[in-house]
Design a protein with these regions (language model features):
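C-terminal leucine-rich, beta-strand-based interaction scaffolds used for sensing/assembly
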Residues: 257-264, 269, 284-420, 439
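N-terminal pre-Walker A segment at the start of P-loop NTPase domains
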Residues: 37-66
C-alpha cells in the first residue's frame, strides 16, 4: 500500500499496475502484504529482492548511509517529498542484516522507544511519513538515547520522515540524519527498464526528448510510471510494426492518462451512444463484444437515460462502435483496447468529468460483477479494478470528494458485494496516500446515526475495522465503540461485537483495551465515556462455545476483576441510556455462566456485587445501581411462585441478599456476606 513508488518499488502485485490487457489486481493479497508489514512481520525475502532489483544509488551516498548506521545504529532518512526513502532504508539495512528486516509496529501518533525492539541482529524501519507535520519535538534526542540499546542487540533502525518536521524535531541530532536527494531520473528509468523482466533496451527511450522532458526533475514514483508505460508499449508492439515516434507518443499520452486524447474524443462524440459504449468497454475490457454492447444500454439506463429500443439494424453495430473507440475484436470475439492503460484512463476521465454520476456508475459496476454473460476472470477482477481506480482517484484528490467516492462505492457494494466492500475499506485505510484521511473519515462515519450512514455500510466498516485492528488496535477500538454507540441495527451490533471479541482474543491487546476503556470512562468528553460503556457492553455480551463470557478468560486475576467491576458499575450507573436488550443479554450470559460453570460462580457474583457496592472503597450505598441490577436479575430469573425455586432463582436471591446485607444503612443479619 506504500504509494511512494521509488526506484526500487516493484511489489509482486501492485495496486498501481495498469497492465496492457487490464487484467486487474489481487487486492486481497495487497491487504495481507500491508497488514503483515505494518504489524512487524519479517519482510518476505523475495519481496525485498524484487524491491531492490531496480534500486540505483550513487556509491558516495551508499557509503554515507552505511557510515551513519555503523556509527550510531540509527539512521534518519528525510526528504521533502518522494525521493525513495523507503528503498534507501531497505538497501542500507539489507547491507547490515540481510533479509532480517521488520517494520516497527506502531500506531500513528503513538509514543516510540527503541527499547521495545528486542530482536537481535534485526533491521527496523520506523515510518513517520504518515505523521505529516506532527512529529514530537524531542524525537531526535530520543533516537540518540536509543542507540546504545540497538547496539547491544546488534540491530539497526532506519527512520523515514519529511524534512521540515525533522528539522524542528532533530534538536541537534543531525548527525543521525541524511537528506535524500532525487536520484538522476535517467538512471532510474534505465534501471527499471533493464532490470525488470521482460528487459527493455533503454538507450532509445532515454534518447527521446519527449521522454527526458517528461521525467526531468521527477521523483522515482513518476519515473517508475514512465518505465511501466514504456514496457507496456513494447509488449503491445512485439512485431515492431509501429514507428518509434508513434510509440513515444502513446507512452506520453498514457503517462498523462490520455486526458488530451479523451477530451478531443468526447468533444467529437457528444452522443451518449458512443460515450456509453466506450465506458462499458473500459469497465468490461476482455468481455465478449455482444456483452459489452448490451451493457452499454444498461449503463445508459443506470445513468438516468432512456435509450430508444433498437429494432433490427437500427443504430450503430459493434463493428462501427468498436472502431469509433479505437478498440478491436479478438479471434474469440472479446473486446480489447489497442492503447496502453486506455480503459483505466477512460474511467478516470468519467469520474473527473461527471462526478455527479459516480454513485450511479458504481452501482452499475457492482451489478456487472453478477453478469452471467461475463467470463469468470473478468467478473472476478472487476471489483479489484474498481478498487484500484478509486484509490488512484483518492490519491489525486484531497478534498471531501475523495472520501465521498469511497463512501459511495462501499455503500453500493455493502448490499450486493459485502466482502468487496470490506476489502475496499480496508485497503484504503492502509494505503500510504489515502490512509490518514480515510481513517479520519471512518471515525466521522462511525459517529453518525443509522439514518445518515446506512447500517449495511456500518456493518462493512465494522468488519474492516476488525481486520485493521491487527495493526491499529487503539484507533480501531475507538471507531468500533463509536459505531456501537450510534446504531440500533442488530447486524451492526453483531459485527461490532465480533470485531471487539477478535481484538480481545489477542493477548497482547487485552491490557491496551483495559487501559483505553479506563481512560475513556474517566474522560471529560461525554462521547468518550459513552464509547467506553458500549465497548465493554459488547464484550460482556460475547461468550465462547461452552457459554463462558469472553471477558472471564482471566477472571481470577485481581487486575482483571477490578477492571470488570469498574466497567459493570458504569453499565449499571448508565442503565437507562444503554441498549436494553444488549445489556440484558450481557447480564444473562454472566449469570448463566455462574449457574452452569462452578469455577465462574464466585468471580461472577463477586464482580456484580462489588459493581453495586464495595465496603472497602464506597462511602455511600448506591441504590440506583442496586435497582438496575435487581431489574436485570429478575428479567433473567423471573419469580415462579407455583413451582419450587429454580437454580437460577436461588442464585438470583443469593446475590440480592448479599447486596442487601452490604447496605450500611441496614443492620447486618447473622450469616455470610458474599465478597466481604
Amino acid at each position: 500500500m506504500d504509494d511512494e513508488r521509488d526506484v526500487g518499488y516493484k511489489p509482486l502485485i501492485s495496486i498501481h499496475q495498469r497492465l496492457a490487457d487490464n487484467n486487474g489486481v489481487n487486492i486481497g493479497l495487497q491487504i495481507n502484504q500491508a497488514i503483515n508489514r505494518l504489524r512487524g512481520d519479517l519482510l518476505p525475502p523475495e519481496w525485498i529482492t524484487e524491491r531492490l532489483a531496480t534500486y540505483e544509488q550513487p556509491v558516495q551516498e551508499k557509503e554515507e548511509l552505511h557510515r551513519i548506521l555503523t556509527q550510531h545504529h540509527v539512521l534518519v532518512l528525510h526528504a521533502p517529498d518522494h525521493p525513495g526513502r523507503y528503498t534507501a532504508a531497505l538497501a542500507a539495512l539489507h547491507r547490515k542484516v540481510g533479509d532480517n528486516i521488520r517494520h516497527v509496529r506502531r500506531e500513528p501518533g503513538e509514543a516510540f522507544s527503541a527499547e521495545g525492539l528486542e530482536d537481535h541482529k534485526t533491521g527496523w524501519i520506523l515510518d513517520l511519513r504518515d505523521e505529516g507535520n506532527r512529529l514530537p519535538s524531542g524525537v531526535g534526542p530520543a533516537l540518540l538515547e536509543d542507540a546504545p540499546h540497538l547496539a547491544d542487540c546488534g540491530s539497526y533502525l532506519a527512520v523515514l520522515a519529511a524534512t521540515e518536521p525533522w528539522r524542528h524535531a532533530s534538536k541537534g541530532t543531525d548527525r543521525l540524519a541524511h537528506r535524500l536527494p532525487l536520484p538522476p531520473p535517467e538512471e532510474v528509468l534505465r534501471a527499471h527498464l533493464e532490470r525488470t523482466p521482460p528487459p527493455v533496451k533503454s538507450d532509445r527511450w532515454i534518447g527521446a526528448s519527449e521522454v527526458t522532458a517528461g521525467i526531468k526533475d521527477g521523483p522515482p514514483a513518476k519515473v517508475a510510471r514512465w518505465a511501466e508505460a514504456i514496457r507496456e508499449a513494447e509488449c503491445l508492439d512485439l512485431k515492431k510494426e509501429k514507428p518509434f515516434k508513434d510509440l513515444v507518443h502513446e507512452v506520453v499520452q498514457a503517462v498523462e492518462d490520455w486526458r488530451a486524447e479523451l477530451l478531443d474524443w468526447h468533444t467529437r462524440h457528444e452522443d451518449s451512444a458512443h460515450r456509453n459504449y466506450l465506458l462499458a468497454a473500459a469497465v468490461l475490457n476482455g468481455a465478449p463484444v455482444e456483452t459489452v454492447y448490451g451493457a452499454a444500454d444498461t449503463l445508459a439506463q443506470a445513468l438516468g437515460e432512456s435509450p430508444p429500443p433498437r429494432h433490427g439494424q437500427q443504430g450503430l453495430g459493434v463493428i462501427a462502435l468498436t472502431d469509433a473507440i479505437d478498440a478491436y475484436v479478438t479471434d474469440d470475439d472479446t473486446l480489447r483496447f489497442r492503447r496502453i492503460g486506455y480503459g483505466e484512463a477512460v474511467v478516470d476521465y468519467f469520474w473527473a468529468d461527471r462526478p455527479h454520476l459516480i454513485k450511479r456508475f458504481t452501482h452499475w459496476t457492482a451489478d456487472q460483477t453478477g453478469n452471467k454473460d461475463l467470463p469468470d476472470d473478468v467478473a472476478n477482477q472487476l471489483a479489484d479494478r474498481v478498487t484500484t481506480w478509486a484509490l488512484q482517484y483518492m490519491r489525486a484528490k484531497h478534498g471531501r470528494r475523495a472520501t465521498q467516492l469511497l463512501r459511495d462505492i462501499a455503500g453500493q457494494w455493502s448490499t450486493s458485494l459485502p466482502e468487496q466492500a470490506r476489502d475496499l475499506l480496508t485497503v484504503a485505510a492502509v494505503d500510504t496516500g489515502t490512509g490518514r484521511r480515510v481513517r479520519d473519515a471512518y471515525l466521522a462515519w462511525a459517529r453518525r446515526s443509522d439514518r445518515d450512514v446506512p447500517p449495511r455500510l456500518k456493518t462493512a466498516l465494522a468488519r474492516a475495522c476488525e481486520r485493521l485492528a491487527d495493526v491499529y488496535p487503539t484507533m480501531m477500538l475507538l471507531r468500533l465503540t463509536e459505531l456501537a454507540a450510534h446504531t440500533e441495527d442488530e447486524d451492526v451490533t453483531d459485527a461490532v461485537g465480533h470485531a471487539l471479541t477478535v481484538l480481545w482474543d489477542q493477548p497482547t491487546s487485552r491490557s491496551e483495551i483495559q487501559d483505553q476503556l479506563d481512560d475513556w470512562s474517566r474522560s471529560p468528553e461525554a462521547g468518550r465515556r459513552t464509547a467506553a460503556h458500549h465497548a465493554f457492553l459488547h464484550l460482556a455480551a460475547r461468550t465462547t462455545e461452552d457459554g463462558r463470557p469472553v471477558l472471564l478468560v482471566a477472571a481470577h486475576e485481581d487486575k482483571s476483576q477490578a477492571w470488570q467491576t469498574a466497567r459493570w458499575r458504569d453499565l449499571l450507573l448508565h442503565y437507562r441510556t444503554l441498549p436494553g436488550p444488549l445489556l440484558q443479554q450481557a447480564l444473562n450470559a454472566w449469570m448463566n455462566a455462574a449457574a452452569s460453570l462452578p469455577d465462574l460462580q464466585e468471580p461472577v457474583l463477586t464482580i456484580l456485587q462489588h459493581a453495586v457496592y464495595q465496603s472497602q472503597t464506597d462511602t455511600v450505598y448506591a441504590a440506583d445501581r442496586y435497582l438496575a441490577l435487581s431489574h436485570l436479575l429478575f428479567a433473567w430469573a423471573p419469580v415462579q411462585s407455583l413451582h419450587p425455586p429454580s437454580e437460577q432463582e436461588v442464585l438470583r436471591d443469593r446475590l440480592l441478599l448479599a447486596l442487601r446485607q452490604a447496605d450500611p444503612a441496614v443492620p447486618a443479619p447473622d450469616g455470610h456476606v458474599l465478597g466481604s
